[in-house]
Amino acid sequence: MSTSAPFHAPRTALITGASSGIGLELAHLFARDGYRLVLLARNRNTLRQIGDDLQARYSTTVRIAPKDLAHPASPDELYQELQEAGVLLDVLVNNAGFGLAGAFTQTSWAHEAEMLQVNVVAATHLTKLFLPQIRARQGKVLNVASTAAFQPGPFMAVYYATKAYLLSFSEALAEELEGSGVSVTCLCPGPVKTNFQKRAYMEGTRMMNSPLMVDVQEVARMGYEGMNRGKRIVIPGWKNQVGVQLLRISPRTAVTKVVRKIQEKKNV
């Protein structure tokens, strides 16, 4: 597996948060369809194993980028490395992100600042850096948000706000790029069966038993297909689609109170 050799491929995709969950499933879909990949995540060994597996399974080329997007310098470092290697992107997938559950008065600012950096700043920065070459190659941007983007989220206030930002950013950018040959898609899944809930300290919330849970492979497939069709927003699962439509016509205060009941710990 290459960590430094340049690519000479017609289609290359960068996927952040590629070591598990939606990002990993998307990596399989892109590799299956002949994309060469740049995979970004924090753990070098995990990335190397994933890269080796994808190369063997799909006969494609994988470049790993072991970086932590919580570090503000990471997007610039990656951009410079790819420039020096002659790698040009056709697709950017901003998938990296995490949540943090709890009352805002009790959660850690250090964790929330890191979440803002990863979920919002890094995704925006990477888009700013790579969009010129994606536009020149008439490529695509796929931002992974959440149905959390459509309403406030008491007891996950900052996380919900980061996803609302991603949705708004994606829709605005899609409109700016209308007619340019570049599509911007925002994937907004509901609860997904991944390690996200554990990292977000969501054990004990009603969300853990939500009937809206969708399989991660299905989420990735719908996001990938929606991106290829140039859809601006993709919401996997008919229950989630109906739910979002109801959110849009319901009083915001009432919606917020419902979300509070869902997010609150059962023993609170």
Spans of model-derived segments:
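Conserved glycine-rich Rossmann-like NAD(P)H-binding loop of the short-chain dehydrogenase/reductase
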Residues: D33-I50
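Substrate-binding pocket helix/loop in short-chain dehydrogenase/reductase
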Residues: A103-L116
